[in-house]
Amino acid sequence: NSTVIQLKYMADLLQKKINIHGLWHAGSYDPADFLGRLIEDKRWTTNIERGMFFAYDYNYFATNFHIELFIKGLFGPPHDISYHREDVMKRIVRTGWPMEYLDETLEQYKRMPKKNIILFPHRMAPEKQPEIFRDLKDNMPQYEFIIAQERQLTKNEYHNLLGEAKLVFSANLQETLGISWYEGSLVDTIPMVPDRLSYSEMVL
């Protein structure tokens, strides 16, 4: 959000003490994210992301995995800026899971009768590996394999589908948080996720 930079400029020029808080979810520093995958010249994106980091007084990340990914992408080789690593670390806050409110939000979808549905709840992107999901479909005809984004679902329709499914599936190569497995577990749908990325902290 470019407003953050404008706010920081004005505060410093007016010598006003403010605190800016930023929540990080993804960026070009992650080579598996579509920003890291599709943007070829990352000199401008990584410099902007570093600038945003230092504009924030507090930078919030849900997992240690994301923190390590962020530091490696923006402050590791070839960026020779280890001289202010202490300043980097003091600006980082690991929050843990930030979405406890979902339990109450999804209350009405709990204890729904289960159908033989396995759900793919992610965006259709290479880093989400939907082809693995389709391969499983060919070998497990007793289940209905549904890719949520292939249907025009309202939020209520999606949550009903999540509540009816027996399993929510991920073979992701990119995940810094992972909301869909958590939503699934709240409505008694079993999460099937890999032991990597943020999943190793959040699920396993």
Language model features: what each stretch is:
Residues 159, 181-186, 197-201:
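Short alpha-helical segment that forms part of, or immediately flanks, the ligand-binding pocket
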Residues 11-41:
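Active-site proximal beta-strand in glycosyltransferases
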Residues 38-59:
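Membrane-proximal helix-turn-helix segments that form the acceptor-binding/catalytic region
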